Amino acid sequence: MEEWVEKYRPKSLNDVAGHNKTKESLIEWIESFINGQKQKPILLAGPPGSGKTTLAYAIAKDYAFDVIELNASDKRNKDVISQVVGTAATSKSLTGKRTLIVLDEVDGLSGNDDRGGVAEIIKVLKTAENPVILTANDVYKPALMTLRNSVNLINVGSVHTNSIPPVLRKIALKEGFEIDEKVIKTIASHAGGDLRAAINDLQSLATGGSIEVEDAKELPDRDSEKSIFDAMRIIMKTTHYDIATSATRDVKEELGTIEEWISENLPKEYLKYKDLANGYDYLSKSDVFLGRVFRRQYFGLWRYASALMTAGTALAKEEKYRGFTRYAPPAIFTKLSRTKGSRQRMKDILKKIALKTHTSTKRARNTLDYMVVVFESNEAVSAELVEYYELTKEEIEFLTNKTIAKNIFSVIAGKKPKVEKETPKKKKKAEDVVPIIPKRPKISEPPKEPLKEVIEETVEKTDKKEKEKKDPKKQATLDSFF
């Protein structure tokens, strides 16, 4: 059975439900392209089922463009994008029509199968002569950071709940079955702004043979792909406990990540110092509970951390703040991406120290702190440390600076014996030969001793021994034993 989503996909922008501003922007963009004005590619960003791909196909149909699409089910690595997209971006189709290139779900590019895909897309976009439309569910993924600078971003919001029932009625009429108005409204409310999900639910009920209100109420809520930006808006704007705690329930992010988002955007929303202080106070208490979860491995504390960071932050303000606030991803994520190389170099240094000291890299960091002090104060000792831990000049420059690294390695170079190159011996001239006169060995003079006293002492001892032999009755003295 054909899916109704494809069967009743709008063929024209006029048939697309809602998105009036987005449609106007797309019309202006495509007409400028047709008139010869160079335009940046369009990136349509929005939740699943909001109609991003439908908008791309509808505008292609309205302006008679052929479509070449690569979606998440296709392999989209560097070679595929270069061959398929790269060729299509600079040529016409076989029918002579202009070509619209659609790259669907570019935020899904990941893993070995899509290696190098984003970089190749950016390269293709710079030379593209045909219009390109990209779609993404989460445009703020780190992998798309460089891509965002090469496109015009258009946010496509969820389809309004009131725009879904007319579409469902139209499909039911064409399929030839009657449906109660309450059933239509129930399906629409469960869809959570996802028109595609609403159509699939309608088809599911119709093929099941029962289209009653009770059956519609048993449908699962489809708001499972709620954006982190929606969660931020709810938490920052509401003053109700239940609404705040449910804001992150369907967001597929860890609590630690949500905490970073709230911490980043609190100062953007809370303009009163008291509100801001109260908000960070609740957030700090949430962080304490998160720490206890990991330290004790008791995950029952999750709910306390979640309530403190959502409801606690929401109720920290005295009243709602009106007006639009532009929320942003945590700056720490961007910083971590930028400092990835530096952190890897530090890991390599710590591994060398840990290997020599037979400790962990965590303990090696304490050793490194003292080593840096030595590097900056004592070049001789530093040279020995560098040789022992087998550190490179680049690593010392990373820890200190180029001057200190140069001085330390100069000391190391001075300790090594110089290997002189052998030069061919020249024949010496007669006048260059210097006669070598061997030095006479020094004759050491005997120590001056009182010779007379030595002789007299020897004679006296001899006479004494002879006398003792002649008189055996007399007891010998102890001197005879020596």
From Swiss-Prot:
**Keyword Cell membrane appears in the UniProt entry:** no
Q: Which GO terms describe its molecular function?
A: ATP binding; ATP hydrolysis activity; DNA clamp loader activity
Q: Which UniProt keywords apply?
A: ATP-binding, DNA replication, Nucleotide-binding
Q: Where does ATP bind?
A: 46-53
Per its UniProt record, what SUPFAM superfamilies does this chain match?
P-loop containing nucleoside triphosphate hydrolases (SSF52540)
The keyword Cell membrane is assigned to this record? no
* Transmembrane regions listed in the UniProt entry: none
Name one process (GO BP) from the record.
DNA replication
Q: Where is the composition biased (Basic and acidic residues)?
A: 442-476
Q: Which CDD domains match?
A: AAA (cd00009), HLD_clamp_RFC (cd18140)
Q: Which Pfam families match?
A: AAA, RCF1-5-like_lid
Q: Which Gene3D superfamilies match?
A: 1.10.8.60, P-loop containing nucleotide triphosphate hydrolases (3.40.50.300)
Q: Which domain of life, per UniProt?
A: Archaea
Q: Which InterPro entries match?
A: AAA+_ATPase, ATPase_AAA_core, P-loop_NTPase, Rep_factor-C_lsu, RFC_lid
For this chain, the family text in UniProt reads: Belongs to the activator 1 small subunits family. RfcL subfamily.
Tell me the function of this protein: Part of the RFC clamp loader complex which loads the PCNA sliding clamp onto DNA.
What is annotated about its quaternary structure and interactions?
Heteromultimer composed of small subunits (RfcS) and large subunits (RfcL).
HAMAP family hit by this protein: RfcL (MF_01508)
Q: Which NCBIfam families match?
A: PRK04195.1-5, PRK04195.1-6
Q: What is this protein called?
A: Replication factor C large subunit
| Annotated source species | Methanococcus maripaludis (strain C7 / ATCC BAA-1331)
Q: What is the lineage of its organism?
A: Archaea, Methanobacteriati, Methanobacteriota, Methanomada group, Methanococci
Gene that produces this protein: rfcL
